């Protein structure tokens, strides 16, 4: 992955292992790439980045082995992985004069299924000054969301989590940019409710950024019957639906990276030393 990413035009955020056969012999917490900022930026923009992230791992092989024992994870999280790669390539191919004024940091975390290992490591040992990250946009399972996947599903469906928790400004921006899309998506906020039994706010990589007071937005089309099953296969992905979510995330990243100032944090910051409890009040527009 890291070697092939070099061809999209963005800079790796660390040492590149060119032989994937050796990866399993060493600890790997994340793949990090950077799309350099454009021109004519202010000092505040020059020193800041926006992060677009995803988790790279699925839960892989089921036990005991049977005829089909490989959980390929097409949606969880192949969909998010390729989406972030596509967005990174879109910005990397852009002429520098047209690029956003802040740099964009693209991160593929590993170990999400094991307890958010990769995102915890990256946020504790950030490849850029942590205080320079103005916002984090997280994508995990963005390839389904149809009526056949969940009762409230439809071709415009996407769940948003955390978008108003730390920054009303960021949440409002996501709403505005969605309305500006040729065909707006329909946001479902029910899983963002504090105390929701699915506890989505605490279960994906965005939380390790939020615990340091970085405004986040989590995009997902939600759980479905093939979640963590051997049937999570590519033929069930709604590709155009996924592409529309990708376009919205790219639009949000562009806007955040071009703003004169970072999104205002007006929500309650979590204690980074404590476990996530999902009891804080979410701010709604």
Where are these regions (language model features)?
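Second-shell loop/turn segments in exported
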Residues: 15-20, 66-77, 108, 156-165, ...
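Stable alpha-helical elements in mature extracytoplasmic
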Residues: 77-83, 87, 100, 115-119, ...
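Alpha-helical metal-binding/catalytic segments enriched in His/Glu/Asp
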Residues: 16-51, 55-116, 249
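Metal-dependent peptidase/peptidase-like ectodomains
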Residues: 109-218
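His/Asp/Glu-rich mid-to-C-terminal helical/loop segments that flank catalytic regions of hydrolases
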Residues: 220-285
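Short, solvent-exposed loop/turn and secondary-structure capping segments
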Residues: 9-17, 94, 116-120, 148-150, ...
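Active-site-adjacent bridging/hinge elements
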Residues: 7-9, 49-63, 220-228
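Short, small-residue-biased leader/transition segments that mark boundaries at the very start
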Residues: 1-3
């Amino acid at each position: 992955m890291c070697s092939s990413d070099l061809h999209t035009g963005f800079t790796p955020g660390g040492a590149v292992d060119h032989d994937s056969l050796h990866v399993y012999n060493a600890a790997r917490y994340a793949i990090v790439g950077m799309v350099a900022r454009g021109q004519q930026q202010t000092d505040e923009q020059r020193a800041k980045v926006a992060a677009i992230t995803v988790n790279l791992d699925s839960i892989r092989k089921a036990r005991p082995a049977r005829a089909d024992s490989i959980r390929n994870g097409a949606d969880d999280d192949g969909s998010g992985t390729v989406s972030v790669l596509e967005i990174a390539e879109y910005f990397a191919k852009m002429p520098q004069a047209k690029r956003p004024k802040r740099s964009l940091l693209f991160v593929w975390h590993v170990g999400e299924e094991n307890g958010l290992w990769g995102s915890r490591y990256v946020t504790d040992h950030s490849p850029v000054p942590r205080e320079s990250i103005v916002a984090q946009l997280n994508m995990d399972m963005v390839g389904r969301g149809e009526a056949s996947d969940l009762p409230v599903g439809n071709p415009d469906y996407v769940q948003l989590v955390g978008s108003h928790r730390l920054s009303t400004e960021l949440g409002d921006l996501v709403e505005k940019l969605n309305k500006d899309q040729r065909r707006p998506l329909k946001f479902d906020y029910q899983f963002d409710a504090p105390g929701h039994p699915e506890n989505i706010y605490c279960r994906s990589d965005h939380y390790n950024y939020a615990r340091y007071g970085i405004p986040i937005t989590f995009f997902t089309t939600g759980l479905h019957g093939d979640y963590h099953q051997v049937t999570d296969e590519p033929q069930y992905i709604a590709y155009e639906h996924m592409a529309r979510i990708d376009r919205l995330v790219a639009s949000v990243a562009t806007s955040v990276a071009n703003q004169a100032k970072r999104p205002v944090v007006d929500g309650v910051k979590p204690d980074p030393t404590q476990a996530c409890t999902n009891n804080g009040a979410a701010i709604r527009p």
